[in-house]
Amino acid sequence: MSEPTRDMTDRARDELELRSRCISEEDVARLLERRAALEVQFGSEGPLARFAAEERLLFAMVRDYWSGVYPELPWATVASAVAALGYVLSPLSPVPEFAVADRVDEAAVMALCLHANQAELAEYERWLTRGTVSC
């Protein structure tokens, strides 16, 4: 891994870990109210667009956990998902030249979150295909 890539990965990991430790139940509730904003962020072109399907699955998993439909999820997974999605929703840099760098950082945070929670996401997807579908 090149030095700039390693630095970005380390920064993204630090950011995700820091934010995950601070997630509260109120943060989960606030995130679940911002579905439309997430659709905009992941629906546009750019580094986040490639995560659109995973973002929808991650959001649905958190929503189903929160509503009690899918209670098997560890809090650490919920916190990590809320932290990553919340990071994507945080305001971009006010300096236009840094906006692209912000998006790349957001993509790195999402990639780390998805990687860290791949087992939980796969299990949730299996649960969905067994016929228990979220509303």
Regions of interest found by a model, annotated:
Residues W75-M110:
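Membrane-inserting effector segments that mediate pore formation, membrane fusion
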Residues M1-A79, L112-C135:
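Terminal, membrane-proximal amphipathic helices
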